[in-house]
């Protein structure tokens, strides 16, 4: 939009000669940068000095506010900024002005809001993200005395200012990364901050790790210098945080390489600290992340001549996760040709993917048009379409509701939406189904009066106005969901897109089942759900209450073909994101030693396993015949719960359902130290509230099982509060409650 202004006009009575509409256009088209210039911890409060970098001449018409937004919940607070002269503004914040009480895992993003001073001016406020230009910003951290948690300022990978709430933080920031013909040189600052442990850093080492069948680990010492310069401008209490400027040099000739294949190293930092008693404490960081998306980190390549062939060294970062790495390979003509062809092939595959994507878009558009046409046809009254996990299973809450309605409401016509590759169980049981995404399915879905689904439907499906959509969901939330997720690492999407699409699909839900009040609160916020929440307990758990008897257990054991005279341990570990050697090459082993378990417990127990399919397909149970049984592909995990005397799991949410049986549980967590950061992405304190003991070794597991086997064993003290919080609504009548709410009697 162009704007023409008569420069001969003059201001009258101190007022601008521009109209409000002209001013609006000018401010919307003016670049305004809001920059945090300084940050100081003033005895518990954070003092912020903010500079507004703009040529806009109408800023005097606006009042500026600092806005804080908690990333997970969306809760906001704001307060006015005080002008200290020119375009600089000052303010002070503490825990009391945060939009909600301080809790572990919170992240607050900072914005500057420009609001018209005059109430009669009809203009939306202008919101700008606050960027940061403060060196070593973490030094201004504060420990909240009420919660004993760190309130930690930091700069995001996009250069913006935020604070996060943590118990501890391993700080690693990079200033410069260079490569020469001799070495890789890295400078920056690092440290360790904690609200609990007063560790003093003794040494830091840079670790280069290569995975695969022949793992390599190399250590390089880091030169440290205490970071004290300018500290007086950041802290009024004189406290010197455990932060150090560092420099590390990695001689290229000391990095192992192979003439046959490329070696790829990930970078870690090893901390060696002293505790209060002078004892050495050692721990590693997670894989090092560059933390600056503006830095493309290109051109960091060095080629060295050796006796055999030239060797190429490259420092790189992964595009999405920003993790740093070093690639090393020979640079012979043969290798260069190989990578040249590989690059050409990669570009060809990329073009094919683009063409396929365009074709799929066209197909989706056609399907959507047909669906909308079909939805205008008369509704088929009392027709219900059920779907579980994208049509791949006959399971979960939809199954429980279907079986209840089949017995108690035969007047309804009920069909299952089934992926044709997973239709065998439906054929065996004689359950009516329609192949998912077929033409018949499209018309059936469009004309059905009810949908009963436990996961998201494709986003392109428009819900007809005559259809009632019951979303059952599929579990009590343990890990963060949807809008509560800080980052999303999934192929084909990003955090913003994932959240937007999730909320768009969730807006179609008319009813949502919640197993307890804890879940209701999370679902409402994370899904931004504002329609009817049915707080009923989970229908799928009716089976665990109504059929918990010796006859049912005996029948299931016969069906599973397992011994009836032995106790059963269900081992259901989760899949780890890092459970691989390289892309497409996974680790197919178990942390729990089955040899040792059989030797100590084989006379009294058997083990049934519910594993990730990649492990299940490649793990050989031959040596454990008669002791360990693989039921990873068994369709109904409820039946595995029912026959099990004991559950062993780790961070899987299966324990919420198993708790309904009031049977013992063990949590086998050998990697709890490295997994702890992920645990802090959970909704509750897993280590404190887990309804059973945490064990780290097979020996500890065996000892715990022997204690459970004793006649005087009682469930741990933590089980009662856990059951009261998560299972109090489960009574065997959840299906009935849901059906009576959604399928109202006519």
Swiss-Prot record:
Enzyme class: transferase
Reaction(s) this enzyme catalyzes, per UniProt: 4-O-[(2R)-glycerylphospho]-N-acetyl-beta-D-mannosaminyl-(1->4)-N-acetyl-alpha-D-glucosaminyl di-trans,octa-cis-undecaprenyl diphosphate + n CDP-glycerol = 4-O-{[(2R)-1-glycerylphospho](n)-(2R)-1-glycerylphospho}-N-acetyl-beta-D-mannosaminyl-(1->4)-N-acetyl-alpha-D-glucosaminyl undecaprenyl diphosphate + n CMP + n H(+)
Protein's recorded name: Teichoic acid poly(glycerol phosphate) polymerase
InterPro entries (UniProt xref): Glycerophosphate_synth, TagF_C, TagF_N, Teichoic_Acid_Biosynth
One Gene Ontology term, aspect cellular component: plasma membrane
Residues of the signal peptide: none
Keywords per UniProt: Cell membrane, Cell wall biogenesis/degradation, Membrane, Teichoic acid biosynthesis, Transferase
Cellular compartment(s): Cell membrane
